[in-house]
Amino acid sequence: LATSAPQGWPRDHKTWDDLRRSASPEIPICEADLIEGFDIDRFLRNFFEKIWNQRDYRKLYEFFDYNLHFEGPTNRKFSGLEHYIHFIRSLMTSFPDLELQINEIYWMGNDVDGYLTSTRWSATGTYSGEGIYGEPTDSKVQIWGITQNQVVGGKIVNEWMLFNEMDLMMQIAASN
């Protein structure tokens, strides 16, 4: 691990806020318009809010198919909702104050064929819990990521998540 933070890290609050505000529009255009049937944009926003920010893990069963297939950072691959729940809980244990914001949602598809989605997000938190990144350091971290989902029948059946885990580890190590 790095002995010091790379140039530009940690970002100051003004830079971070400017980057977060660069997503436009801040709310989805369709939010003002009622959508008949399944609203994929609202579904994804509810998922991220309920699971990542409110930590209502019971809702995972509403959003995900039990046989979920997942691929994520550092070549994580597994099948089954219970493995996904373990992964989410391990991140939340490591970063108990993690707050996630959706920057953009892109999607294509329909109710018959299903949807392919891409959600660009950012998060801030403190590495203050036990976890896979070593002893807690109380390091403030900033994470940028993309989560892609395949949604069929109102359930997420495949998820691909990407964030720079090496950058995250560098932020944690730089505060030591």
What annotation goes with each model-predicted range?
Residues 1-176:
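C-terminal and inter-domain tail/linker signature
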